[in-house]
Amino acid sequence: MVRYFLFLIATAMLIAVGPVIAQADNFQSWLTDLRGEAHQRGVSDAIFDAALGDAKPIKRVIELDRSQPEFTLTFDEYLNKIVSKTRAQKAAQKLVEHDEILTEISKKYGVQKRFIVTFWGVETNFGQYLGSFNVPHALATLAYDGRRSAYFRKELLNALQILEEGHITPSQMKGSWAGAMGQSQFMPSSFLSYAVDWNGDGKRDIWGTKPDVFASTAYYLKKAGWNDQLTWGRRVSLPDNFTMDGKDAMTLADKKIRKNLQLWAAAGVRSADGSLLPKANPVARLVMPSGAKGPTFLVYSNFDSILDWNRSNYYALAIGHLSDMLK
């Protein structure tokens, strides 16, 4: 009877362990296939092994990728979470602390200093939290998982290329569970396209070299169409029962509907305090993040550049609000 009981335990253990062993074998086979593709990208065996030699799927990464938030923040809740007085005060201090280098970078790329610091503050709290995940391992997990494997496989190969170029070591390549890296939280593809070696040391170090971080942020925004003659937009007030061209406000709050600022002014749109809109005449569009009963904004082309960085209206408005506190 005891032998039979032990046999049952052993059988159960084999059944439980079997899928794990199979998964591990499949992952190693997948890595072998990836190695060949990495070779074609110029990645050496030494870098591949240093980055992925001990890699295995990270359970927590899968959990985070598949988890759904229990609730959705309202715009006001999100704004209060991201744009605090403490963060604004710290941003103002950073503007003064790094004024010289920020001024140089701002002039070269045509991006206002306050926006560079704002992105830095929102992304990583001014470099204080970069993420603790091993980026190659996290990306390998997501690429192997299969939900968005093609995207993350490309990002993993990009990460290996960054390592091959010597910008960072595998052990130092830390970031978010999804692979966003450094103080600017660039995905590897964004790093390869936009990261800047400002100090000329041969490394585009967005992890530890602040001038590289600032220049990379500014260059990204420049390539996204930033115009330093404009701000991001402004909060506005609408007249009661507002319509324009026979359309109500919610219908007008469409990315495709853009009008010169003075046309909005002629239709009765005013600044949030009731004053007239500026006399400048950039193209603007309505954004109403909380619907008809919430706040209303007129945003300019720079707002779209922010959306290029992060596609959330909440995020872009938070960037705008925090930057306004640094004027």
Predicted regions and their residues:
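C-terminal soluble interaction/assembly domains
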Residues: 239-327
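Secretory-pathway/luminal and periplasmic proteins that interact with or process carbohydrate-rich
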Residues: 57-64, 124-133, 145-149, 165-171, ...
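Substrate-binding/active-site groove segments that recognize
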Residues: 134-143, 156, 181-196, 217
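Sec/Tat signal peptide C-region and signal peptidase I cleavage site
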Residues: 18-24
